[in-house]
Amino acid sequence: EGRARGPEYVHTVVSCYKEAIESVLDGSFTEEKKDKWDERLSTVFNRGFWDGYYQGQKMGEWTKDYGNKATEKKVLIGKVIKYFSRLGVAEVAVEANTFVKGEKLLITGNSTGAMFLNAEEIRYELNPVDKAEQGWRVSIPVPDKVRPNDKLFKLVVN
């Protein structure tokens, strides 16, 4: 999986597949879990889901639409400037788009991979704010190490 796809795609697909395999092996597989995995998988690049060639379908029969059917899309916000390891906080430059408290974010980078988080807190000049404006440098708590020049995106409903 993941040929020519972003780190968020690889992270989501591999996580879902791993959880599915583990649940089959430990006997905890349910239709509810399958539905949750399908929902998560639908957030990243896909052309719809089908039963595959095992059900006798041929190429071209598996989707009615052309292109990506992901339910979420990435919107570039900016980049990481610095990571403060003792605080678990990243300083980010808000360059392309704004974001608000509570939005779903994604940080990607060559070493970072894909890090999903919610904007639970935003600080501008040490003060809490509800919205990060273009041109600002803000700090946000992050769950793990990020690196300078990692890209920051918000995930919005497609």
Kindly give the residue locations of the regions a language model identified.
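Accessory interdomain/linker segments of ATP-dependent helicases and helicase-like nucleic-acid enzymes
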Residues: 35-87
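Beta-strand/loop-dominated core regions that host nucleotide or nucleotide-derived cofactor-binding catalytic loops
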Residues: 9-12, 19-23, 27, 64-158
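C-terminal helical cap(s) of enzyme catalytic domains, especially alpha/beta-barrels
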Residues: 2-42
